[in-house]
């Protein structure tokens, strides 16, 4: 009986490891929202880390989070390191490319609770009187991440946060005088 149980456990472990081994080497999470405003309105909110408190889904998770800013006030070279509780961890963002009212690319380095280095891109596409804002995150999937993804995907982990952030971004960009 014990030998049979051990064999079942080994088969399950090997199965999970096998599934992890065939997971993709990279991940992509993407969400979008239509904003009833010209592209410059949402662009101003994502291109300036000082304004992320108006819409970022993670800002409210730790009111005592330590934030700082370095480099230019906005655009390419703007840097935003943070350190907070276990819900937000610690890390650093840097705008690596900013194309006015069309695109913002950010290098996102997580330091805690796990290390990860990803790229986040906000693309703003005019659609008549509105703007489609697309939020995309891509990054590598080391084996530990692949193992985790057997049970829960990156999309399931952070997709809901992207959706919540885009709802807040939409509201902030559509606010009169934004």
Where are these regions (language model features)?
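A generic structural micro-feature
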Residues: 23-25, 72, 85-87, 112-116, ...
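Extracytoplasmic/periplasmic/luminal assembly and interaction segments
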Residues: 49-99, 147-148
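Beta-strand/loop substructures that line and gate deep hydrophobic ligand-binding cavities in soluble
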Residues: 96-97, 107-163, 169-171
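Hydrophobic ligand-binding cavity/cleft-lining segments
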Residues: 4-67, 72-73
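Short, surface-exposed coil-to-beta transition loops
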Residues: 28-30, 88-93, 115-121
């Amino acid at each position: 009986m014990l030998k049979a149980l051990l064999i079942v456990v080994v088969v399950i472990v090997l199965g999970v490891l096998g599934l992890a081994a065939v997971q993709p080497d990279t991940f992509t999470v993407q969400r979008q929202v239509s904003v009833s405003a010209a592209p410059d309105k949402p662009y101003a909110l994502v291109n300036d880390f000082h304004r992320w408190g108006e819409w970022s889904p993670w800002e409210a998770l730790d009111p005592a989070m330590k934030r700082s800013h370095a480099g230019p006030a906005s655009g390419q070279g703007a840097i935003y390191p943070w350190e907070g509780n276990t819900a937000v961890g610690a890390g650093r963002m840097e705008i690596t490319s900013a194309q006015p009212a069309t695109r913002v690319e950010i290098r996102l380095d997580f330091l805690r609770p796990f290390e990860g280095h990803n790229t986040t891109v906000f693309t703003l596409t005019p659609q008549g009187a509105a703007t489609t804002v697309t939020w995309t995150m891509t990054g590598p999937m080391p084996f530990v991440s692949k193992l985790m993804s057997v049970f829960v995907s990156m999309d399931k982990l952070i997709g809901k946060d992207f959706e919540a952030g885009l709802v807040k971004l939409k509201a902030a960009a559509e606010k009169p005088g934004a």
